[in-house]
Design a protein with these regions (language model features):
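Mobile cap/lid helix-loop segments that border enzyme active or cofactor-binding sites
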Residues: 72-73, 187-273
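C-terminal segment of N-terminal export signals and the immediately downstream linker at the start
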Residues: 10, 31-67
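N-terminal secretory signal peptides
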Residues: 1-13, 23
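Histidine- and aromatic-rich segments of cupredoxin/plastocyanin-like copper-binding domains
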Residues: 120-123, 129-132, 232-421
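Histidine- and aromatic-enriched segments that form or immediately flank copper-ligand environments
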Residues: 52-178, 250, 255, 282, ...
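Conserved small/polar residues in nucleotide/adenosyl-binding loops
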Residues: 424
């Protein structure tokens, strides 16, 4: 993509332009920057997404100019915002969602985790042909569930360029999760580079964006702490497998900027509360690549819902979730301000927002934790999807049928005796 494709008017300095956009990513103040006669929307917005509700909703897919890093780029947006509008619907309703594609290429919207007829699922080549340029596709389905979900494009790299939004379905009856107020927190990642170029680089060199490779300094640290034999063996097994102990993600902050409801860490999304209120946070991982470790320093979170399903409440200090997952948590803030801190699993960056009693109050932002090397259990222990899967609890299951697995390759070979499966 040509960095000089879009130039600023001579009367506006680059410094002023970047400063003016520091609190938001999508251009709203400079409609003359947008090319005339194109599908671009010149009235785009960012931060907490606008909210749409009702039984009939209209969405428009278009291109918008964005600036998250000081560089103007083209995004794929729904109704001109990143994230796309939050859709707040009700269980039991039949909804009609009219989606118009103004792009020059096909597009689609997939309703992630929603029970519906396959024709409405929004996956091109599988459930329908896609939404062709200039066409309007009408999604119509009954809402058979409630909870926190999301929607996104299933075409090309459009999700990666901004086409995602929250989908909140209120229960038919009174919600058993009671809160004084709530906020949607949609975490995502953004790249200024052409996603196809990013993908092409990964195909040539899978670790090209991994800037946490083991170093000589790491070796001497292990040598000092664990001795020569341990330091060498720790590296030998990875070398023999031609793998890296820091292969935690395909991409990193070398390619990505991390967004919190469409806002960069500098922009600092903000949600207000009153002390003692119970606040519901609907976390959605809308990233294309990134696993986030989420915590709110000095404030515990009680997980009450996972992927739209109510769960037995569990109080945690931190949780990890990957692309496509959702968690609803309850918090009861007592101080003036808290930072919602979502650091990436490979520890190269973070998204963050603030909960506060007023707009002029901030909380400290913690430093990113040191990267942790993977262990063999991380790489192999969870790859089997049978009864030997390391993360599954089979303690309440009947004993498995005795089978001799010793001649089979794979993790199951280590558990030739069925009784050992009950340990996992």
């Amino acid at each position: 993509m040509d960095d000089n494709k879009f130039k600023l008017p001579a009367s506006i300095s680059r410094r002023r332009f970047v400063q003016g956009l520091a609190v938001g990513g999508v251009i709203a103040s400079f409609p003359h920057v947008v090319r005339a006669g194109s599908s671009f929307k010149d009235n785009a917005a960012t931060g907490s997404a606008p909210e749409l509700s009702g039984k009939v909703i209209e969405l428009t897919i278009a291109e918008s100019l964005v600036n998250f890093t000081g560089v103007v780029r083209t995004a794929t947006t729904i109704n001109g915002s990143i994230p796309a509008p939050t859709l707040r619907l009700r269980e039991g309703d039949e909804v009609t969602i009219k989606v118009t594609n103004t792009l020059s290429v096909p597009s689609s919207i997939h309703w992630h985790g929603i029970i519906l007829p396959y024709q409405m699922d929004g996956v091109p080549g599988l459930s329908f042909k896609g939404i062709m340029p200039g066409e309007t596709f009408v999604y119509k389905f009954n809402l058979q569930q409630s909870g926190t979900y999301w929607y996104h494009s299933h075409s090309g790299f459009q999700e990666m360029t901004g086409m995602y939004g929250a989908l909140i379905i209120e229960p038919r009856e009174q919600d058993i999760i009671v809160a004084d107020r709530e906020y949607v927190v949609q975490l995502s990642d953004w790249t200024d580079d052409d996603p196809m170029k990013v993908f092409s680089k990964l195909k040539v060199q899978g670790d090209i964006y991994n800037y946490n490779q083991p170093t000589v300094r790491d070796f001497f640290r292990d040598l000092s702490e664990k001795g020569l034999s341990s330091a060498l063996s720790k590296r030998k097994m990875w070398q023999e497998m031609r793998m890296s102990p820091t292969d935690l993600g395909d991409l990193s902050s070398a390619a990505l900027t991390y967004l919190f409801n469409g806002s960069t860490p500098l922009a600092n999304w903000r949600g207000l509360f009153k002390k003692g209120e119970k606040v519901r946070l609907r976390f959605i991982n809308g990233a294309s690549n990134t696993f986030f470790d989420v915590r709110i320093p000095e404030l515990q979170m009680t997980v009450v819902q996972s992927d739209g399903q109510n769960v037995h409440p569990v109080t945690v200090d931190e949780f990890r979730f990957g692309p496509g997952e959702t968690y609803d948590v309850l918090v009861t803030p007592q101080s003036d301000a808290y930072t919602i801190f979502a650091q990436t699993i490979e520890r190269t960056g973070y998204a963050r927002g603030t909960l506060a009693v007023a707009n002029n109050i901030n909380a400290p932002v913690p430093a990113v934790d040191p990267v942790e090397w993977l262990a063999m259990a991380d790489m192999m222990g969870n790859m089997s999807h049978d009864a030997t899967m390391g993360v599954m609890d089979h303690s309440q299951h009947a004993p498995a049928m005795p089978m001799d697995l010793s001649q089979h390759a794979g993790p199951a070979a280590a558990f030739a005796k069925a009784s050992t499966c009950l340990l996992y």
